[in-house]
């Protein structure tokens, strides 16, 4: 009897500070910051109650519990897992020490830290009056049984659905299109992982057969023009809203604006490959690195029609094997137009970043010297990338002043193009956002999860050399991606659009019935898609 009493006494001795661990997790789950693994937490709870007869055993038990507790907390959070970190190891090792320290500091959510301290103080104040372990155990038991009574606290993420209007593009069998279109509806309940996986495979198969229509050749009498594509790193629609720049007057000068354009990824390398392979439907992330498909390579298709290729960067293209990947995975043959530019920023990996306006003006000198009747120029800018700082400064510069400086340079470039009288199709198509605001599942500046805030980017088109175009932009309100943009370029060529001052056809006709693409975004270790009015997330090989 004495032995049983001693055992019971040790059992009811309580969890001690582990109560704070569990209670904090319960609150974080209620707020949507965690996805609580109930049975794993029960196992940890019970393990902590096991008796330890010696000091050495008690220390060992606490060390084991500490390791398990940290691993469990990490797995329940939305933080990148080990697989994601390893997949991005090459890029991470390029970060400067100063940038890493700033990321760690900025990662801390001070409101949550203060809330945790408050819970700790309450625990110390209450532990002499109530059995806190009993409260924690009852709370955990409630979380286990409450789903059976329909009162479980929400563990849903903050991936807010924002359904856009539009119709599914035609071109495949009716039943496949209908199956994809069904996902545009709404549903009160949640879809199963098996249902979403099946729909995703249907989506990928459908997209694989879609190809943008380009003319076979250009007639000798057709009016020549230049195509300029600005691929901008770290600029989403949500970033512009957060920086109060969404209504900047520079954007009002554009003729076409895509309101729901999905870049389909949140990293630069895959974004570049998706753009360069944008003359086809949307491939999976893994397919970007498979066998090349020449019919998808928009720069090479334009080259075959007589558009001379040029490439301009405000960086070296070395980081993360960026330039080499574009050449080997997307067949980019454009010569890299190098010049010694004035330095505007120093990047997170200590690389010099060129002055934006200087890069723009280099284009004019290159095309004027080349004297090609038609050209297509791809620009890639990283001036807005997180972690950039002014030369000589140690602290990174905020997004908003860098974005304003970039837009100001763009405004000057637009004015230069207007003065030049050149016929130009200027296209802005950002890679992805900077995650200026973040959300409950991902802190600001982190882009491991390609959420809608990061992948919905402000794509715009402006025509130069035509003086009778409408003053107000035409908005494309359906869900679109790179295939729609490639199709638009094909229509501009096919209609000989620059042959008349008002355009060969109305702008509304150019964008009418452009191919739509369902909102599906992927990185190597995370996927986000919209299905029946809700956004779903899949981490690595897990469940939706």
Predicted regions located by residue number:
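Transmembrane and membrane-interface helices of multi-pass
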Residues: 1-172
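Histidine-centered active-site microenvironments of extracellular/periplasmic hydrolases
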Residues: 3-7, 422-423, 429-467
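Active-site-proximal alpha/beta segments of enzymes that process anionic O-linked groups
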Residues: 153-389, 482, 487-505
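Generic structural signal for small/hydrophobic residues in well-ordered secondary structure
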Residues: 233, 302, 379, 410, ...
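A short beta-strand-to-alpha-helix junction
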Residues: 289-296, 396-406, 447-455, 467-489, ...
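Active-site His/acidic residue clusters
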Residues: 320, 363-408, 412, 435-446
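Marks the mature luminal ectodomains of secretory-pathway proteins
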Residues: 404, 408-411, 462, 487-490, ...
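Phosphate/adenylate-binding glycine loop and adjacent helical scaffold
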Residues: 497-544
């Amino acid at each position: 009897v004495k032995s049983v009493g001693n055992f019971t006494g040790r059992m009811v001795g309580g969890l001690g500070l582990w109560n704070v661990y569990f209670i904090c997790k319960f609150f974080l789950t209620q707020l949507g910051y965690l996805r609580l693994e109930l049975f794993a937490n029960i196992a940890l709870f019970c393990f902590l109650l096991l008796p330890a007869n010696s000091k050495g055993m008690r220390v060992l038990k606490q060390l084991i519990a500490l390791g398990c507790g940290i691993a469990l907390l990490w797995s329940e959070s939305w933080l990148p897992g080990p697989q994601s970190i390893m997949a991005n190891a090459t890029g991470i090792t390029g970060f400067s020490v100063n940038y890493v320290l700033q990321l760690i500091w900025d990662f801390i959510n001070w409101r949550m830290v203060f809330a945790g301290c408050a819970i700790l103080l309450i625990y110390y104040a209450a532990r002499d009056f109530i059995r806190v372990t009993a409260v924690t155990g009852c709370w955990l038991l409630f979380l286990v049984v409450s789903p059976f009574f329909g009162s479980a606290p929400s563990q849903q993420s903050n991936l807010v659905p924002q359904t856009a209007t539009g119709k599914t593009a035609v071109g495949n069998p009716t039943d496949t299109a209908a199956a994809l279109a069904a996902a545009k509806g709404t549903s009160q309940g949640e879809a199963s992982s098996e249902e979403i996986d099946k729909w995703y495979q249907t989506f990928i198969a459908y997209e694989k057969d879609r190809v943008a229509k380009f003319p076979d050749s250009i007639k000798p009498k057709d009016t020549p023009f230049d195509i300029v594509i600005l691929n901008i790193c770290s600029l989403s629609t949500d970033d512009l809203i957060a920086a109060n720049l969404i209504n900047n007057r520079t954007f009002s000068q554009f003729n076409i604006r895509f309101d729901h354009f999905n870049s389909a990824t949140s990293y630069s390398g895959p974004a570049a490959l998706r753009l360069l392979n944008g003359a086809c439907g949307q491939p999976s992330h893994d397919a970007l690195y498979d066998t090349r498909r020449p019919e998808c390579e928009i720069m090479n298709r334009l080259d075959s029609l007589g558009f001379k290729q040029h490439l301009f960067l405000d960086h070296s293209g070395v980081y993360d094997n960026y330039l080499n990947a574009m050449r080997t995975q997307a067949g980019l043959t454009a010569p890299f137009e190098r010049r010694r530019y004035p330095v505007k920023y120093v990047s997170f990996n200590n690389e010099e970043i060129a002055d934006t306006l200087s890069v723009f003006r280099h284009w004019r000198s290159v095309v004027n010297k080349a004297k090609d009747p038609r050209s297509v120029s791809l620009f890639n800018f990283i001036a807005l990338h997180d972690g950039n700082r002014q030369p000589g400064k140690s602290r990174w510069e905020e997004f908003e002043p860098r974005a304003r400086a970039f837009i100001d340079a763009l405004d000057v470039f637009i004015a230069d193009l207007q003065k030049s009288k050149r016929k130009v199709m200027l296209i802005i198509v950002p890679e992805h956002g900077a995650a200026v605001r973040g959300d409950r599942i991902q802190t600001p500046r982190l882009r491991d999860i390609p959420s809608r805030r990061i992948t919905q980017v402000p794509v715009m088109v402006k025509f130069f050399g035509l003086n009778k175009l409408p003053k107000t932009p035409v908005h494309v309100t359906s869900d679109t991606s790179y295939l729609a943009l490639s199709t638009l370029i094909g229509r501009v060529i096919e209609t000989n659009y620059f042959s008349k001052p008002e355009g060969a056809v109305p702008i509304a006709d150019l964008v009418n019935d452009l191919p739509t693409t369902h909102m599906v975004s992927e990185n190597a270790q995370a996927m986000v898609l919209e299905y029946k009015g809700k956004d779903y997330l899949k981490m690595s090989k897990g469940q939706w």
